[in-house]
Amino acid sequence: MRERDPIAGPAWTRIVALLGALVLAPCCNSSRAAECTITVGVVLELTGPAGDYGQAAAKAVEMAFRDLNAAGGVRGCRIVTNTKDSQSQSTVAVDAANQLVQLGKVPVIIGGVLSSVTIPMLTAVTGPAKVLQISPGASSPKLTALGREGKTNGMFFRTITSDALQGSVAAKYALDRGMHRIAVIYVNNDYGVDLYDEFARTYKGLGGVIVSATRYNEKQSSYASEVTAAMAAAADGLYLISTPVDGSTIARAWISMGGPRRFLLNDGMNSADFIQGVGAKYLSEAYGTSSGTSPTVSTASFEQEYKAFARMDPGSPAADRAYDAAAIVGLAIAAATRAEPAAIRAALFTVTDPKGTVIHIGEDEFAKALALIRNGKPIRYEGVIGPVSFDAYGDITGPFRLWRITDGAVTTVGEMSVDEVNALVTRLGR
């Protein structure tokens, strides 16, 4: 099946419209807000292998700021965005972040979705410049390590859980599904390497056998050589750590070369594009793991509103977490003593205070939140993914979702709590 060109046709038209919409954020009713704006930088993967993720995330950011502006704006101003496409490439992302920080003087950047894009932005630009960065999708454990080492200057946060735990969840899920001997093909970047390492430690500790582990480089027209290497020994299934476009190519090669049609998939493969690219009939034994949610009133509201607003699936990877990232940023700007990075960072904890008044998503809830903030009261943002609480390194905790592909659709079949995962890791002496 021919791969879709991510920078041609209707998809590119959507991206152009998206960029325009993000700059022209809706105006609130406040006359003062109509006179001033506060710009938030956004660097997302609108094209390239993760283009579907980035587009879904960008629309969610736009929706969150629409709701905040409709609620009266922050600090008497509208929030607008300066949005740039990283093209799913680290070098492009670094250049974009540099422009936003050095020329745009933005106090905060939302992005990226991929760890391989997010980490270079952090280490080369936002960390040294002490500009706040919040990612809705970068799950590499390396980001926690950078925080511990002081290399983030305390300016990095994310609304997704670390793969340090997801790898362990995937290992147990694979064994529970009868994959005792597994081949692994994983993307050769920070995300893929870190997730594989965490998976391998737990999987082997539980008695599983990794018959082959093969890295691949992105955006190749064929992965026949990688698949051949992965099939060097008999396996019960394939753990494929990839993105929908490359993952489709690899899975098709695996199937055509006679590999067992049993798959374990990472969170980014929770995608209709992947299912369509491979063919649902070949994926009846495809299982996956993702960061889960703790459903709140906000969850149901988002699913309804996002579909109408974005004309996209609210289950798209990064959409829910991007809305929460943007909402938290906007509320923190409102609560900050000034619209500067350090002040906004401090205010992140004011708007996610476990002792604060609970606030859900949407115009009415944000209006209530802004009134409380003006009166010096803390709030507890309970977003689309549930209550959000950051630790000293900008990490959050949350459950993990277990899913499978059934009749061409992703279906949730279970969950592992953080306590269950930690107990597993402790049992293995890690």
Mark where each language-model region is.
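Bacterial N-terminal signal peptides
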Residues: 14-26
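Bacterial N-terminal signal peptides that target proteins for export
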Residues: 2-17
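Extracytosolic ligand-binding ectodomains
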Residues: 2, 18-19, 30-430
